[in-house]
């Protein structure tokens, strides 16, 4: 159920099909008889049961269609055993045709709002655009990139949108989002809600013109007022805006060179301040060093997955995916244990790509044995663990509130040599305690996965007394 809830908060269009006891045994106590439809209803866009064999295909199409109606999300469909097993005449079955069971969702909303947004951006001196998960989910990234480049606007990415621009792109910005939002005169938020990751909308400049674009009308203007709200397909909207500006002689692109140069200088300064952490040679290993080494290891075909608390927060500062679709994390729900499932799915969907999942030791323990599942299905991957022998993000808050005596209750995990998991399954495992061995260990894991077809586990022992700044500030609660 946590996986379904993760799909809901991450706006992932996943169709879940579950079983049920025979309808003839309803309420008789049949095997695993539970109200699955009712349980799934609050965490899906659509939850229903099939009551007729003739309707199975039709109901599947309805559930799939709901996954893509408005903002994407999960559906749940229950098929009782006798409904599934019964044979019926094919002429009595409703079978929707592929490609014809749902309408296009590339709506741009009110054309007048497109004109308003185009005018705002053209006149803006210091615009900033944040591209969220929806931009990648609905495959609107090319249109988004076109707008950034066409109008010379700095772009920031969060969630699954990370990687839409390569790190060396002149319109890619990473560390200066807070700076841009404090100084920008126009801020456009595309496909991401004002949730805890965005400070519920409170971190934007108070007098800035704020525009929000989203596929779900319920998300627009939630948690804060905006100057202009557009409901529709992010890619279609951004393309329509760019099309309007092509007829304008001065779209402001040249005027904004100084604005981008200013942000670039701050980016450089902030990166330089982080370098001592990224290059730290401390013992135990600093978690920032691990994230930096992983970033240096990635290539254009590596799908990076973060599964944990602090490891995700820290890696978001260091890891810069090289291509669209190459970043996955627990999403807005923030639940641990997603990594192995994400890695398995990524390997099956993109068998020619390399998959690397960076876990905390707490999250790795939740799904470690499914590495065998990944191997069995031909989807081996590289598992890297930042092991501090604790549920450390939770531990920080507990220590701060209750002190050493009571703060360590339930969050210390012990020293586990997780590399043994890979070895017992026929893959490569290595324990790393020297920061200079991180890179070589990752290379050995890569070579082993390629040559042996089994997942590799690199267990890196990190300092439990180091935390991400967001953890120290407890920003997830503010």
Model-inferred region functions:
Residues 1-23, 177, 183-186, 191-195, 205, 376-469, 474-477, ...:
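Thiamine diphosphate
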Residues 28-30, 103-116, 285-286, 308-311, ...:
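A general structural motif
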Residues 210, 294, 306, 345, ...:
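Hydrophobic, well-ordered secondary-structure elements that form the walls
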């Amino acid at each position: 159920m946590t996986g379904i809830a993760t799909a809901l908060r991450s706006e992932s269009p996943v169709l879940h099909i579950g079983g049920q006891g025979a309808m003839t045994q309803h309420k008789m106590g049949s095997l695993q008889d539970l109200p699955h439809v009712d349980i799934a209803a609050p965490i899906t866009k659509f939850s229903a049961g099939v009551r007729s064999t003739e309707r199975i295909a039709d109901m599947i199409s309805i559930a799939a269609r709901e996954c893509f109606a408005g903002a994407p999300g999960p559906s749940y469909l229950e098929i009782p055993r006798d409904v599934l097993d019964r044979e019926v005449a094919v002429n009595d079955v409703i079978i929707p045709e592929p490609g014809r069971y749902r309408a296009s969702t590339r709506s741009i909303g009110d054309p007048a709002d497109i004109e308003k947004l185009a005018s705002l951006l053209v006149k803006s001196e210091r615009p900033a655009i944040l591209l969220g998960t929806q931009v990648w989910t609905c495959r609107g990234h090319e249109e988004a990139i076109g707008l950034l480049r066409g109008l010379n606007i700095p772009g920031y990415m969060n969630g699954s949108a990370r990687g839409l621009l390569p790190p060396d792109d002149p319109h890619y910005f990473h560390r200066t989002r807070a700076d841009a939002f404090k100084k920008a005169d126009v801020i456009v938020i595309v496909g991401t809600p004002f949730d805890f990751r965005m400070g519920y909308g409170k971190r934007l400049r108070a007098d800035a013109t704020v525009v929000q674009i989203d596929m779900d009308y319920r998300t627009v203007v939630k948690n804060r007022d905006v100057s202009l709200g557009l409901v529709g397909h992010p890619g279609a909207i951004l393309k329509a805006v760019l099309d309007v500006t092509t007829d304008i002689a001065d779209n402001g692109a040249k005027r904004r060179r100084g604005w981008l140069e200013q942000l670039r200088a701050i980016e450089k300064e902030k990166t330089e301040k982080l370098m001592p952490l990224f290059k730290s040679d401390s013992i135990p290993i600093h978690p920032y060093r691990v994230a930096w080494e992983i970033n240096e290891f990635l290539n254009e075909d590596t799908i990076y997955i973060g599964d944990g608390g602090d490891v995700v927060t820290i890696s978001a500062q260091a890891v810069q995916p090289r291509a669209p679709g190459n970043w996955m994390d627990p999403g807005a729900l923030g639940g641990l244990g997603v990594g192995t499932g994400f890695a398995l799915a990524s390997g099956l969907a993109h068998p020619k790509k390399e998959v690397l999942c960076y876990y905390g030791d707490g999250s790795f323990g939740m799904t470690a044995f499914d590495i065998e599942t990944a191997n069995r299905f031909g989807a081996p991957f590289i598992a890297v663990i930042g092991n501090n022998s604790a549920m450390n993000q939770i531990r920080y808050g507990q220590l701060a509130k209750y002190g050493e005596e009571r703060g360590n209750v339930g969050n210390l995990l012990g020293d586990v040599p997780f590399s043994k998991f890979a070895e017992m399954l026929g893959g490569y495992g290595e324990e790393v305690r020297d920061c200079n061995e991180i890179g070589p260990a990752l290379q050995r894991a890569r070579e082993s996965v390629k040559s042996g077809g089994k997942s590799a586990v690199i267990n890196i022992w990190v300092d439990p007394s180091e935390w991400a700044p967001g953890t120290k500030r407890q920003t997830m609660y503010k």
